[in-house]
């Protein structure tokens, strides 16, 4: 269920401060964050944000199509290796 419009987008304050600092200085270094729940806002466009997936930080380059989505959507937490093959199908 989407968030109410009257509440506005959720963004952790520590991440917002890092984004504002990077935009001011023009720094292209990835911003490391554990905040998967934060929403992508227009001021993040063009930045690389390293989102934690539980094991490592996955670099996510923010483009304009990503606005309104959450950071965690772009850093998968599970690796799918496929189902076991049928032994009968191999013969």
Swiss-Prot record:
<dbReference type="InterPro" id="IPR005732">
    <property type="entry name" value="Ribosomal_uS19_bac-type"/>
</dbReference>
<dbReference type="InterPro" id="IPR023575">
    <property type="entry name" value="Ribosomal_uS19_SF"/>
</dbReference>
<keyword id="KW-0689">Ribosomal protein</keyword>
<protein>
    <recommendedName>
        <fullName>Small ribosomal subunit protein uS19</fullName>
    </recommendedName>
</protein>
<keyword id="KW-0699">rRNA-binding</keyword>
<dbReference type="GO" id="GO:0005737">
    <property type="term" value="C:cytoplasm"/>
</dbReference>
<comment type="similarity">
    <text>Belongs to the universal ribosomal protein uS19 family.</text>
</comment>
<dbReference type="GO" id="GO:0003735">
    <property type="term" value="F:structural constituent of ribosome"/>
</dbReference>
<comment type="function">
    <text>Protein S19 forms a complex with S13 that binds strongly to the 16S ribosomal RNA.</text>
</comment>
<keyword id="KW-0694">RNA-binding</keyword>
<dbReference type="GO" id="GO:0006412">
    <property type="term" value="P:translation"/>
</dbReference>
<dbReference type="GO" id="GO:0019843">
    <property type="term" value="F:rRNA binding"/>
</dbReference>
<keyword id="KW-0687">Ribonucleoprotein</keyword>
<dbReference type="InterPro" id="IPR002222">
    <property type="entry name" value="Ribosomal_uS19"/>
</dbReference>
<dbReference type="GO" id="GO:0015935">
    <property type="term" value="C:small ribosomal subunit"/>
</dbReference>
<dbReference type="InterPro" id="IPR020934">
    <property type="entry name" value="Ribosomal_uS19_CS"/>
</dbReference>
<dbReference type="GO" id="GO:0000028">
    <property type="term" value="P:ribosomal small subunit assembly"/>
</dbReference>
<dbReference type="Pfam" id="PF00203">
    <property type="entry name" value="Ribosomal_S19"/>
</dbReference>
